[in-house]
């Protein structure tokens, strides 16, 4: 991943796994894609200078795909009333043995810094709103669409419009 003038480039999950490297946002997106593939309800958590992942424990979504209200997230992580489980994804690569419970503790600790909270992205709500995943690369000549169909790269290129009209 690289920093741009505004934002940051994010590696696709297959690149993170293939290259065995990634920034916090790369790891959060990869983990969220694994949660979604398992039928769970991922949240990508973004705070100033860092990203990590969460998961809704109940089958429901927020009203919008981007949640910038800290209290809407925080109140769902209170012990005994937990609807969201947070995970520090960089713990999976820290080089030392960090178990899942500790990664969850570190994920929850990230939320204790309300001043630096930017937003959470509710992936399930985004899907309900029509946002689809980027097709995943199978090999250099074919990709798999979000619906599981496999097509050659040339098929996707042929289907792309020759020119986009904006405005």
What are these regions (language model features)?
Residues 1-167:
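A structural boundary/capping signal
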């Amino acid at each position: 991943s690289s920093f741009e003038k505004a934002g940051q480039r994010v590696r696709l999950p297959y690149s993170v796994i293939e290259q065995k490297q990634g920034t916090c946002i790369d790891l959060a997106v990869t983990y969220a894609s694994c949660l979604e593939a398992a039928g769970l309800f991922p949240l990508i958590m973004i705070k100033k200078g860092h990203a990590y992942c969460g998961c809704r424990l109940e089958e429901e979504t927020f009203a919008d795909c981007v949640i910038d209200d800290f209290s809407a997230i925080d109140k769902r992580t209170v012990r005994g009333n937990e609807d969201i489980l947070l995970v520090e994804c960089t713990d999976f690569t820290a080089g030392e043995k960090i178990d899942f419970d500790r990664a969850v503790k570190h994920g929850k600790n990230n939320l204790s810094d309300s001043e630096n909270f930017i937003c959470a992205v509710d992936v399930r709500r985004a899907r309900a709103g029509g946002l689809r995943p980027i097709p995943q690369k199978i090999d250099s000549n074919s990709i798999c669409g979000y619906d599981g169909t496999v097509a050659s790269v040339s098929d996707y290129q042929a289907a792309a419009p020759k020119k986009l009209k904006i405005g």
